[in-house]
Amino acid sequence: MTLVVVPVRYPLSRHSRATLAEAVDIAAKRDADLAVLHVDLYQEGRDVSRADLKRAVEREFGRLDRVRYVVRRGFLVEEAILEEVVETGADVVVIGHKQAGRWRRALRRILDEPDVEAFLRERLDSTVVTV
């Protein structure tokens, strides 16, 4: 079964809604399951639950079929996203252009010319869609 993972902010920002809309469309076209992921950063001191995330998404998009809501806790958004993608064997990762910029900055510490899509493709065998 194909799996699409989409990281979003909570509460949903305008960019998160656009990224999520694209992920919902991709999942429908590929007859795929969808994992909506929020990374709850320890340093922000919030305690977002899966129920909170689900309510926020359903308020914007209505009830979605074949969706799993995931809240990971961590210090680095990028690391938590990578963990989710690796653990689930996601086929497609849909990220917003702002998130892609953060990934580039994180990868710049490791690589000379960070190409987020190529980095993820090589290491995860996933398609990366930037919205």
Residues covered by each model-derived region:
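Small/aliphatic-rich secondary-structure junction motif
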Residues: 2-47
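Short, structured coil segments at secondary-structure junctions
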Residues: 30, 63-65, 123-125
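Short, well-ordered secondary-structure micro-motifs
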Residues: 16-17, 45-49, 79-82, 105-106
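Mid-chain, well-packed structural core segment of small domains
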Residues: 58-97
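General small-molecule cofactor/ligand-binding pocket signal
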Residues: 35-37, 68-72, 129-131
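Charged helix-capping and loop-helix junction motifs
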Residues: 20, 50-54, 108-116
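Short, surface-exposed acidic-centric catalytic microdomains
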Residues: 42-59
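Gly/Ser-rich helix-loop-strand patches that form or flank binding pockets
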Residues: 91-131
